[in-house]
């Protein structure tokens, strides 16, 4: 018998299900967190990383109590989150802002500029994301954030997709170079592909905006497929989650 905790971060709540390899799903619990919107700006949608992690603790402890499962029997966490939710962090992987959620659509101009330059330069990557770069995706959101937060640029180290930020937090990673990055999340959303050695070339990113100088290196890490182990739960979060 092996039990896995399936963790699913949605737009308004996180759900934790305990699944037994023999018996199937044993139980599920969820916990909500706030979604920040602005009446004067319908494109604005953000969420706090701290709020999400607090909800994860609440949901995990609730499902453990509901099922009376021995925490020692849980062998793994399988993590799923919303895609296209991006967070900028400092050199210690501490958030510089809230997540720009998938439904945050402020980066229209940046997405149009990426699409235009990609076609102008015959960038192969644009064909792999339908020929149009979306305002929901990573480079557009990050460029918007850098343009609108000049006071935070000096502390900016890298940006992470939602799933990678949660994984790094649970593992206890504080070095951006050690972050496990999901190939699924970084694929068309950040135009990552082994065909062109990962991310788009630095010359393209710098031509898009000098604020992206050096950004390719900043988006380094361990790029992994979804069947890989991102890491191991650290003692702090094992204690917080009751595992």
Task: Describe the role of every protein-language-model region.
Residues 1-98, 109, 214-217, 222, ...:
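N-terminal glycine/serine-rich phosphate-binding loop of ATP-dependent small-molecule kinases
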Residues 9-11, 125-243:
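Gly/Ser/Thr-rich active-site cleft segment
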Residues 49-51, 120-121, 177-178:
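Short, intrinsically disordered/low-complexity patches at protein termini
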Residues 67, 118, 149:
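Active-site catalytic pocket residues across diverse enzymes, especially alpha/beta-hydrolases
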Residues 91-97, 101, 113-119, 124:
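Hydrophobic or amphipathic alpha-helical targeting/insertion segments
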Residues 104:
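Carbohydrate-associated surface elements
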Residues 111-114, 145:
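Hydrophobic packing residues within well-ordered alpha-helices of enzyme cores
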């Amino acid at each position: 018998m092996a039990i896995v905790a399936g963790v699913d971060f949605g737009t308004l709540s996180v759900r934790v299900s305990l699944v037994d390899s023999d018996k199937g799903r044993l139980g599920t619990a969820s916990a909500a967190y706030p979604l920040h919107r602005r009446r004067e700006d319908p494109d604005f949608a953000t969420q706090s990383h701290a709020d999400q992690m607090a909800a994860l603790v609440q949901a995990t402890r609730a499902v453990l109590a509901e099922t009376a499962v021995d925490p020692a029997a849980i062998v793994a966490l399988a993590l799923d989150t919303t895609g296209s939710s991006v967070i900028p962090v400092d050199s210690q992987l501490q958030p510089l802002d809230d997540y720009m959620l998938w439904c945050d659509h402020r980066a229209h101009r940046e997405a149009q500029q990426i699409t235009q330059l990609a076609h102008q330069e015959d960038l192969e990557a644009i064909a792999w994301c339908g020929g149009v770069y979306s305002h929901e995706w990573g480079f557009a959101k990050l460029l918007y954030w850098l343009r609108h937060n000049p006071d935070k640029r000096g502390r900016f180290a890298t940006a992470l997709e939602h799933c990678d930020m949660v994984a790094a937090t649970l593992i206890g990673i504080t070095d951006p170079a050690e972050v496990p990055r999901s190939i699924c999340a970084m694929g068309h959303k950040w135009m990552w592909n082994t065909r062109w050695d990962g991310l788009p070339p630095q010359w393209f990113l710098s031509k898009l905006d000098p604020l992206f100088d050096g950004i390719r290196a900043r988006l380094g890490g361990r790029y992994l497929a979804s069947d890989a182990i991102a890491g191991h739960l650290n003692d702090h979060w094992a204690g917080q989650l009751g595992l």
